[in-house]
Amino acid sequence: MIYSLLIIFFMFFSFHRMDLAVSNTYRFSFETNSIPLWIPKKVSMLWIFSIGNVLAFAPFGVLLPEAFTRLSRSYWRPAAAFFAAVIFLELMQMVTFLGSFDVEDILVNFMGFTIGFAAWRQGRKVDSVFKGILIFMAYIFLLTVVLLICAEFINRFLL
């Protein structure tokens, strides 16, 4: 619950979002020309923000199935619940003028959830809590690297 509130705070009130509310202009983007992730040649604030947008939502891949045990039987139930919640939050950002409805954000947030869920599933397979946490962290790292490589390939050769 606390983590969810923290994410909502960042989505609505950080990064000078209150300055955006003054304009009373709906901001939205329903299209994407690329996956907003890449392998950096040089680390920049934009890249950190983009990768942070993935990793910030990875914990929901653990929190949703753990909080609602009925959701943990498959990937699709918690994924659908997360997807609906992210769409709702993106819409709220737009209608409150504290952000924008951005399809790329939904895509990247959902990738983060999926990474978290896959890592959680792998970490649960061991009996030791310590080993489970290590496996979880290793999978988060590994899957994030794989995601960056895939996004770079798709952006460069397929889009």
Feature roles, as predicted:
Residues 1-97, 103, 117-159:
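Bulky hydrophobic segments
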Residues 108-117:
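Alpha-helical transmembrane segments and their membrane-interface exit regions
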